[in-house]
Amino acid sequence: VTTWTDHTADRPISLTAPSGIDRAAHHRLDEAWLAAAWSHPSTRCFVVSGGQVLIDETPDGATELVMTPSFEAPLTEAHRYFLGTDEEGTSFFALQKDSLPGRMDQSARPAGLREAGLLLSDRDAGLMAHAVALENWQRLHRFCSRCGERTVIAAAGHIRRCPACGAEHYPRTDPAVIMAVTDGEDRILLGRQVHWPEGRFSTLAGFVEPGESIEQSVRREVQEEVGVTVGPVEYVASQPWPFPSSLMLGFMAHATSTGINVDGDEIHEARWFSRDELGAAFESGEVLPPYGISIAARLIELWYGKPLPTRGAF
């Protein structure tokens, strides 16, 4: 597998750029340290609820997470997750609650990761992705998979422990491959899932199966979904996608066949596009580009040679 690191350096994919946060995993089991960090006046926290946070606009027009000093944040009916520290030693926590707090001013508003990830700084986007992933995992794994008893939160949100049998459960991450497939004529293969509306096309993707390498997964998914055979596979970049717990592994893949035979179960339609054809389809509205935060958009851009239009993006 070769990599496209040089091609992505100038425009890093959303949620992959360095966040400047040290996750400091060695502190997660240190209750005394966590208590001291929580009570420190520099510590900041924010609320996550249902995959959303509050964001606000700064005086200079940037967008940031709405955070408060931790000592001002009540822990009533909230789960506390330690997210890490920055270079200045500031600690960051997320509070999982049933609802977001009341807006602090008229400009603050709730936002999910798909929207906020495009607007926030690398630091804030990384903190939000971490918090949303933990919230999703906590919500879906409340009971022990070994004995069925209810588990409790440990390690500042990064472990669920079963008091009944002693089992420890860790946050789940599901690897998935996503690939921009091109052919000998340098066309790109895009597909439309069965539940997507007309015009919504993107790169092919699928989960890695047990006992399978990521390269094997790329070739299998393309063959299963559209009947196209893939040869060389080139790794590009990865992207956390906590909806609820995926890690997207992005590839460029070269097809050794071009005949399309969609499976009808996952993919309803698939087409080869030249750059001119795709550009014209974007312009006419025949094809809607993927949303800018997604690794799918960046994979297509690497082939397309320029940013995708934002009008009509999904």
What does each of the following model-derived ranges do?
Residues 82, 143, 178-180, 190, ...:
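Conserved hydrophobic/aromatic beta-strand scaffold that supports enzyme active sites
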Residues 130-182:
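Cys/His-rich short segments
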